[in-house]
């Protein structure tokens, strides 16, 4: 197995203090005397038998994001949705089940193979019936899984050939991971996992980093780079110049190195906060408050930035929520306040039966991609504020004993600009070896685009918030079921009697009037 650790440090300030020191197991363990954000990449060659899942689906990838935010350096700016997300690409596109169609009694056979693959490689017990389906993909979401799944992968593929060889494990740092991913490298026949770890000194007061290769035959590379200021957070496509030291366990001494790359993921200007309008009923509204955001500028063509960048929000909603695509069509309706409309629904997949109670749904939930139309006359690069509201619906929850509310939680949507590239930019594009290519939302866009992610707003100096919205859904109290049933029955009977009496009164009153008229005529 090969391990590559990339550390972003301030070489101008701490360069003379940085060194690579072998640990207890010689070159198999290093202590790096600097603490800064880092990305660990593990690549493990596998056999055809390990990749049997590709006989049933075209691809499988996994992405995980911590439900709390942290400052991300530009080089590791790719945003991850909170929780664990699995994307399975079908071998052939097919239409998903539509509203009103009968549910299949068994999970799709290919998903059974996917569940087995995830269990073997990541230790994830996934129910194949909980996947939701779009025309080209299956997706799965779990808010409770942590970074330990990626440690399971490293443990599995780090079995030393010599049983007497000591297994060196520093995977406890995975507990601090901010994000992680897992994918299949089809060309190299490798399984790859990447883990991004924040500045441990800043968040956890650790001053050194310990990095190891598990066995003597494994390869370990550690790079410490200084990020040049040319890679700005406002750049349409910023150029990052990286200089630093590279340690390779197959070589005797660290080497100076220099890279020029163009990150596909960038940190956009401004911030976002997300919440439901309060109080929350059965028809809540999700509010996005975007502050000091700016349309990314194209530094290669100053008159070209606005028309190439568009703003999106990618939602993942648990089964307690459903999206009404007919109601969301109203986002495009023009008003005096929104002359171009508020936005438009571009993609929606997941649980199809809108009025089905939550306790009858099998899939984990639904996903939606929405384009947001900015209302601004500000030129590109100029900050402005924007509010966006998305109407939602809550499913009926199962009655509970002694409870009138069911606690629920939904992850924040990802909010980002997507900017198209010109042919010249694509031709001169310098691919970053640190780019994330297997995040679920990236399959919704062409390859030749860059992303500018809008991060969460800090909560009044108390640090970053949890990237989730909590609420209570009203439920029936099962303790009061008998009383409510009896009361309802009495009221129904009483109502029936009242209506019957009213009808009979009219009938008898009509007969009496007829008799009266008849008597008058006879007189």
UniProtKB/Swiss-Prot annotation:
Cytoplasmic side: 505-523
Listed InterPro entries: Pbn1, PIG-X/PBN1
Lumenal side: 1-486
Spans through the membrane: 487-504
Protein's pathway: Glycolipid biosynthesis; glycosylphosphatidylinositol-anchor biosynthesis
Predominant subcellular localization, coarse grouping: endoplasmic reticulum
One GO cellular component term noted in the UniProt record for this chain: endoplasmic reticulum membrane
Topological relation to the membrane, as annotated: Single-pass type III membrane protein
Annotated glycosylation sites: 26, 387
UniProt GO BP: GPI anchor biosynthetic process
Cellular compartments annotated: Endoplasmic reticulum membrane
Listed SMART domains: PIG-X
UniProt entry keywords in alphabetical sequence: Endoplasmic reticulum, Glycoprotein, GPI-anchor biosynthesis, Membrane, Transmembrane, Transmembrane helix
Domain of life where this protein originates: Eukaryota
Purpose of the protein: Required for proper folding and/or the stability of a subset of proteins in the endoplasmic reticulum. Component of glycosylphosphatidylinositol-mannosyltransferase 1 which transfers the first of the 4 mannoses in the GPI-anchor precursors during GPI-anchor biosynthesis. Probably acts by stabilizing the mannosyltransferase GPI14.
UniProt-listed PANTHER family: PROTEIN PBN1
Family affiliation: Belongs to the PIGX family.
Name of the protein in question: Protein PBN1
């Amino acid at each position: 197995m090969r391990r590559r650790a990339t550390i972003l440090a301030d070489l101008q300030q701490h360069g003379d203090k940085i060194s690579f020191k072998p640990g207890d197991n010689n070159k198999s363990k290093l202590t790096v005397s600097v603490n800064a954000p880092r990305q660990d990449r593990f690549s493990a060659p596998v056999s055809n038998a390990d990749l049997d899942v590709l006989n049933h689906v075209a691809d499988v990838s996994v992405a995980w994001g911590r439900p709390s935010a942290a400052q991300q350096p530009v080089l590791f700016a790719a945003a991850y949705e909170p929780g664990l997300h699995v994307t399975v690409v079908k071998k052939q596109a097919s239409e998903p089940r539509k509203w009103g169609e009968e549910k299949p009694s068994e999970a799709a056979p290919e998903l059974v193979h996917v569940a087995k693959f995830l269990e073997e490689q990541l230790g994830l017990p996934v129910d194949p019936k909980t996947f939701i389906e779009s025309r080209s993909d299956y997706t799965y979401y779990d808010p409770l899984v942590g970074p330990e799944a990626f440690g399971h992968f490293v443990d599995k593929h780090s079995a030393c050939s010599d049983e007497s060889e000591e297994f060196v494990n520093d995977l406890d740092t995975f507990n601090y991971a901010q994000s992680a991913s897992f994918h299949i490298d089809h060309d190299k026949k490798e399984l790859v996992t990447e883990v991004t770890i924040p500045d441990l000194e800043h968040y956890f007061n650790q001053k050194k980093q310990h990095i190891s290769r598990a066995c003597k035959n494994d390869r370990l590379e550690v790079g410490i780079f200084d990020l040049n200021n040319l890679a700005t957070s406002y750049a349409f496509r910023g150029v990052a110049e990286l200089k630093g030291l590279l340690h390779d366990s197959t070589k005797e001494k660290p080497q100076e190195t220099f890279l020029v790359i163009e990150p596909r993921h960038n940190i956009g200007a401004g911030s976002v906060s997300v919440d439901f309008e309060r109080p929350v009923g059965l028809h809540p509204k999700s509010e996005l408050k975007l502050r000091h955001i700016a349309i990314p500028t194209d530094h290669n063509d100053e008159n070209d930035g606005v028309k190439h960048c568009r703003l999106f929000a990618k939602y993942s909603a648990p089964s307690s929520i459903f999206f009404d695509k007919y109601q969301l069509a109203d986002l495009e309706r023009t008003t005096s306040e929104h002359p171009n409309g508020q936005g438009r629904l571009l993609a929606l997949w997941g649980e199809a039966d809108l009025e089905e109670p939550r306790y009858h749904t099998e899939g984990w939930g639904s996903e939606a991609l929405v384009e947001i139309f900015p209302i601004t006359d500000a030129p590109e690069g100029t900050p402005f504020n924007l509010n966006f509201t998305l109407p939602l619906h809550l499913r009926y929850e199962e009655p509970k004993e002694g409870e009138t509310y069911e606690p629920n939680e939904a992850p924040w949507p990802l909010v980002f600009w997507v900017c198209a590239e010109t042919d010249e930019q694509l031709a001169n594009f310098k691919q970053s070896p640190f780019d994330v290519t297997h995040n679920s939302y990236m399959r919704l866009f062409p390859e030749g685009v860059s992303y500018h992610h809008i991060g969460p707003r800090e909560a009044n100096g108390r640090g970053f918030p949890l990237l989730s919205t909590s609420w209570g859904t009203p439920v029936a109290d099962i303790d009061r079921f008998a009383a409510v049933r009896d009361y309802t029955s009495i009221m129904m009977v009483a109502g029936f009697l009242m209506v019957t009496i009213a009808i009979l009164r009219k009938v008898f009153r009509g007969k009496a009037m007829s008799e009266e008229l008849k008597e008058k005529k006879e007189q």
